[in-house]
């Protein structure tokens, strides 16, 4: 397994990460999920992705079971919370810690930052960032990041707002795939900002939860190899069987960065199906937006939004 620096944290992580949503899926038994996680850790894949809201907590519970009996020392554990105010974010974090059976998480991220208003809520007085900083001070978390999948401009707003508050994120998670380069591109707009700042880049949705593969235009190997060839710290991929785990290791184990010409060729190959975001449903629909169904996680709208919408 190839290992890469996680930004400026001083930590090295596996170039491939195990996606947390897939290990909590009902089609997979808890015992099989634990077997997959431990097989990945035994083979050197140490980056474990998760989130408070994945499958109503089942993903975190399964990861927690897998980390027992000495496996915690092999893992870099990341999870995410959706709360936008201090109280809700702190509540979700404590629940995640309990499910995982841990006193400390390596990386906690603001999940699903997909609206400009999300940024305002996170950094407002009494916002989620206060809970994150308090958790870090208390030794509950080591590093802080954020994720989002809708619009690169929201990511840029989050980065600039953090800078205005004198804060620097350790990591940023975003879609990086062969279609992204053509439509609302995180690769073009956000990736250069992160690499210049030395922030750890967490790539996700290299196959768009399988939707990109439904186009029949690209293969899993092309999708994953392209994402790995970008300046990422880790590419998180969904694995819900030992067969898929083996395939991921075959790609990762034999990985050699694509040449500039090879990457350009793949971009050209994907252009025809990428123009309108049809196969990047996470950008163009609410199908992947858990917070859209749970406004109570977000709390009140930001003061700016309230002011702008006031009659």
Positions of the model-derived regions?
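Short histidine/acidic/glycine/proline-rich micro-motifs that form metal-
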Residues: 22-24, 52-54, 81-84, 177-181, ...
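N-terminal binding-site loop/beta-alpha segment at the start of enzyme catalytic domains
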Residues: 1-75, 131, 137, 310-311
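Glycine/proline-rich, positively charged
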Residues: 27, 84-189, 195-202
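Conserved, mostly hydrophobic/aromatic
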Residues: 6, 18, 40, 48, ...
């Amino acid at each position: 397994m190839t290992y890469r620096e996680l930004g400026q944290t001083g930590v090295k992580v596996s170039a491939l990460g195990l996606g947390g949503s897939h290990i909590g899926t009902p089609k997979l038994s808890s015992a099989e999920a634990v077997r997959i996680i431990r097989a990945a850790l035994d083979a050197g894949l140490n980056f474990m992705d998760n989130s408070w809201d994945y499958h109503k907590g089942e993903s975190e519970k399964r990861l927690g079971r897998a980390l027992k009996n000495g496996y915690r020392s092999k893992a870099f554990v990341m999870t995410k919370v959706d709360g936008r105010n201090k109280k809700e974010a702190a509540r979700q974090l404590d629940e995640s810690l309990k499910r995982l059976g841990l006193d400390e998480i390596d990386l906690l991220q603001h999940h699903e930052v997909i609206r400009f208003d999300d940024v305002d809520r996170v950094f407002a007085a009494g916002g989620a960032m206060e809970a994150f900083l308090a958790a870090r001070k208390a030794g509950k978390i080591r590093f802080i990041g954020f994720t989002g999948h809708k619009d690169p401009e929201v990511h840029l707003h989050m980065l600039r707002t953090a800078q205005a508050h004198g804060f620097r994120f350790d990591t940023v998670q975003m879609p990086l795939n062969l279609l992204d380069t053509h439509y609302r591109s995180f690769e073009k707009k956000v990736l250069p900002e992160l690499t210049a700042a030395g922030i750890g880049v967490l790539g996700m949705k290299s196959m768009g939860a399988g939707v990109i593969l439904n186009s029949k235009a690209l293969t899993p190997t092309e999708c994953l190899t392209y994402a790995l060839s970008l300046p990422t710290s880790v590419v998180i991929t969904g694995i819900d069987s030992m067969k898929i785990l083996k395939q991921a290791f075959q790609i990762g184990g034999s990985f050699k960065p694509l040449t500039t010409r090879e990457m350009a060729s793949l971009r050209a190959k994907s252009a025809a199906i990428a123009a309108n975001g049809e196969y990047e449903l996470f950008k163009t629909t609410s199908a992947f937006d858990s917070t859209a169904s749970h406004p109570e996680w977000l709390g009140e709208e930001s003061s700016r939004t309230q002011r702008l919408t006031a009659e």
